[in-house]
Amino acid sequence: MRRTDRRKTGRKTGKKRISTVTLLVIILAVAVVAGGAGVLAVGGGAVSGKLPDFHVKDVNVSPLTGQVYEGELPARPLIVSIDNVGDAVPQSNLSKADLVYEFPVEGLQTRLQAVFYGEFPEFFGPIRSTRPYFVDLTREYKGIFLAHGWSPDARKYLMSDVVPYINAMNTDCSFYRVSDKNAPHNSYIKWEEVKKKIDSEGWWKDKQDIHSFSFLSG
């Protein structure tokens, strides 16, 4: 008799637990259908009031680095030809660039091509002349090219309007030379001068589908 009573008691307790779970599921379903008009309290019942509104900021992911930026990214990047010989070191604001390429030039020297897109520093330099393959890089990124001087072939290439460019040899932008380095390793330009030229030419009016990279998530 005692064993039978225990089994009966166990069945009753099980039914009671199932009924409680079912009731909680029904209450949760009603709360969801109600559109979050009330928030369930831990102790039972509901707390009146609407759920808080969360505003998600407008962000954009750089196709060059995968970094997230608030607000809109520019229509196209800026590629700057940077000196890389001993007399030019240290260069200014290279850490602000999204990408930096190193290319060989004459005399066993190299030159840097800095790609700026997510952030633009106060000034750039020391700026040096261009070569045709620097222009090719700018075309790949649908960018704006900034340099001081050019080889004969690079001049012909740029003059054919393959990319928008700013060059100290034929621009109204104000380049300047710093006193702590010797020419030709001391040519600089301020970002406000570059931005003024970009705006006046309308180079940022049309968004470009620029070259992008794939990044691993997590």
Regions inferred by a protein language model and the residue ranges of each:
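N-terminal Lys/Arg-rich, disordered targeting/topogenic segments
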Residues: 1-21
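Hydrophobic membrane-insertion alpha-helices, especially the h-region
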Residues: 24-37
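Hydrophobic single-pass membrane-insertion segments
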Residues: 35-51
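A surface/extracellular/periplasmic glyco- and lipid-processing/surface-interacting theme
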Residues: 49-101, 106-218
